[in-house]
C-alpha cells in the first residue's frame, strides 16, 4: 500500500540541528522519518511542513525561518535527485506513481509566517507551498488558535468559540483558494473553523486533528464539524499524538495506542464519511509513549 503522509516537522528539526552545529542526514537519522524509512514504508508522498515559532525569543523573523526551511527542502531534492521528487500539482502525482521516487510537497504550519502579507503568501506559493495552517498555537494577524503553549495539561478545557478569523484572515482564505493552496484548519479555534466552513468555496483539510467525542481535547473536531466537513468533501487527518487520542485523566500517563487510533478513525468515518479520513500522522513533532 502506498503511503501519503500529509504532516511532519522534519524540516524544522533539520534546521534546529543545523543551527546547533550538529547537522543530521536525511538519508538516515535519529528522527522518526528519513529517506531509508520512506523506502521501507513504501511512501508515495510526504508533506514537509515549514514549522515556525512566533515568539521573538525563538525566531528573529518567522518568514526568514520559513524560507530557511524551504531552502533545506530544495537542498534535499538536489542531494537525492534519484530518490526524491517535488510535487506541486495533481499531474505531478501521476508522474510520481511511475517514477520509482518518493514525492515531497511543501506545506507551512503557522500562517503568521506571512507577516499578514498577501504578497508573501503568493511568494510561498511560487516556491511550491501547497497547504498552510492559518495558526499554530499563537494568536496572529489572521486568526486565533484553540490552545496556547504551556497549557496542554489543562484538559479538558473550554474551546475558543469567539475568536475566529480576522478580516485579513478572510482575505487569506480567499486568496489561498484562488491559488488552489489548501487551507488547513488544524490548530485553529472553533470559531475560526466555523468561519471557514461558512466562506470556503473549495474543500479544505484538518491535517492532524481527531474526534473530540472520543477525546475531549480542543485540538480535536466536534461532531458538527466532522459532519459539515464531510458534506464539503474535506479531508480529516488522524493525529497519532497521545494527547489527542487518550482519555486518561492523568495527562502525564497518556499513550498513543493503535486501539485509540482505530477508535477515532471509525468515529470520523461514521460522522464524516469514509472518503474524508486520511492519515496525517504528525509523526515528527510529537513525543510521549508511542505504540506505532
Give residue spans per PLM region.
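Aromatic-anchored, glycine/proline-accented short structural segments
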Residues: 192-232
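Histidine- and/or cysteine-centered catalytic micro-motif in compact active-site loops
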Residues: 188, 209-211, 239-243
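Loop-centered beta-sheet repeat module
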Residues: 159-209
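Short, glycine/acidic-enriched loop or turn micro-motifs at the edges of active sites
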Residues: 8-10, 187-190, 211, 285
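N-terminal hydrophobic targeting/anchoring segments and the immediately downstream early-domain regions
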Residues: 1-158, 216-292
